Amino acid sequence: RDDVESRGLGDVYKRQDKYRTLKVRTNADTPEDAKRAKELGAEGIGLCRTEHMFFEGDRIKAMREMILSKDEEGRRHALDKLLPMQRGDFEGIFEAMDGLGVTIRLLDPPLHEFVPTEEADIEALAKAQGKTVDQIKAIINGLHEFNPMMGHRGCRLAVTYPEIAKMQTKAVIRAALNVSKAHPDWNLVPEIMIPLV
């Protein structure tokens, strides 16, 4: 907000608001981004990319645990760790937008984007997973694709691993319900986008 005001754009935006007929939404992937966007006049979020939420601390560890799991039970165990983190992010985003529309896109990129590439990180992951470095490298190599844009991602990922989409959908709906209970005057309707259909 200070940037906008210091550059004299605040008055420009206010004048434009008198004449425009379009609503302006923003891209925001964190509660902080959403809050800043709202302060700058955004009237909702047009795209919240959930994959950006997975790259921090314990989240990336749980995401990698899910990717490296050999069966659905292992994936569900890792996803159970991610569920409260995702729900908390969505609650923060809904709160920041004060009941305005929020479109949340379910996981889109291929899984290889979440695995480490540096040798030290691969070694640490192998140790944490109780696997050898060669086993981890084999899994990572198996995830890489010739053309990731047309490969195993988006809705195709959700078909192969429906538990991922289920966890994210559950997180969105629970967050919306929790925020709606706290703000019964808001007409909070979460918008869920299925990627790359």
Protein language model annotation of sequence segments:
Residues 14-197:
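Conserved alpha/beta-domain cores
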Residues 2-13:
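Single conserved hydrophobic/aromatic residue that forms the stacking wall/gate
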